[in-house]
């Protein structure tokens, strides 16, 4: 139940942004259906990094180089590039305001918000399996996301709430990001935020079809040409048993 997930997600417990369920014992091929919960106990449609982790488990278990993962709204195809690197095909981004979703029909590429007296210009909203808004700024770490992140996440324009990314272009191939994750809070990494940022950078003609998205810890390579693909490392931390 959600209370148990919230308890386990606390940093003085297991500590996680997402908990993902799939029946490993029933995996006889390299395919699996997954259910994803944020650390606030709510079920969500997508988790890019979590899906790559599941893909590595499937590839290791089945001794195959490919895996197929079914989420609540997408079929994701993964490839094991090396022992600890997984590429995940995320499908096409969604730009339709009703499907992002937004609460009103406005230009999703140029969303201006006044948040706690701070003017935020030309936010780009899209859906990459879950809803995101990306603001390109001069210094992505100048903003206090612990303060303004939840205000943007819960803004009336976003009926299903939204993930928030402040992005800073370093050069033609590298972007730094600071991310407030819907239902999880300030995060050190978010796969779908990396995907959203890569798409927005391309659409704004800031980068080409491929770019590296840098978080506080590590980076992901995003390629976008109609479809999105995300490549990055996966590492085992610890195997534990818990009672649910």
What label would you give each PLM region?
Residues 102-112, 150, 154-159:
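Short, conserved active-site entrance elements at the starts or edges of catalytic domains
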């Amino acid at each position: 139940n959600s209370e148990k997930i919230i308890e386990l997600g606390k940093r003085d417990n297991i500590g996680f942004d997402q908990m993902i369920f799939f029946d490993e014992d029933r995996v006889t091929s390299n395919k699996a259906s997954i259910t994803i919960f944020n650390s606030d106990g709510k079920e969500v449609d997508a988790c890019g990094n979590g899906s790559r982790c599941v893909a590595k488990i499937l590839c290791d278990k089945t001794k195959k180089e490919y895996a197929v993962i079914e989420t609540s709204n997408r079929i994701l195809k993964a490839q094991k590039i090396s022992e600890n690197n997984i590429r995940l095909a995320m499908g096409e981004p969604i730009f339709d305001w009703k499907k992002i979703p937004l609460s009103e029909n406005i230009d999703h590429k140029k969303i201006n918000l006044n948040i706690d007296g701070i003017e935020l210009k030309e936010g780009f909203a899209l859906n990459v399996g879950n809803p995101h808004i990306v603001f390109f700024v001069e210094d992505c770490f100048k903003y206090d996301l612990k303060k303004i992140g939840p205000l943007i996440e819960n803004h009336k324009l976003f009926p299903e709430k939204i993930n928030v990314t402040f992005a800073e272009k370093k050069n033609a191939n590298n972007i730094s990001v600071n991310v407030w994750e819907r239902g999880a809070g300030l995060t050190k990494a978010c796969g779908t935020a990396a995907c959203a940022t890569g798409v927005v950078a391309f659409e704004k003609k800031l980068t080409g079809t491929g770019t590296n998205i840098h978080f506080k810890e590590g980076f992901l390579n995003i390629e976008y040409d109609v479809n999105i693909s995300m490549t990055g490392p996966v590492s085992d931390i610890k195997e534990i048993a818990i009672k649910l």
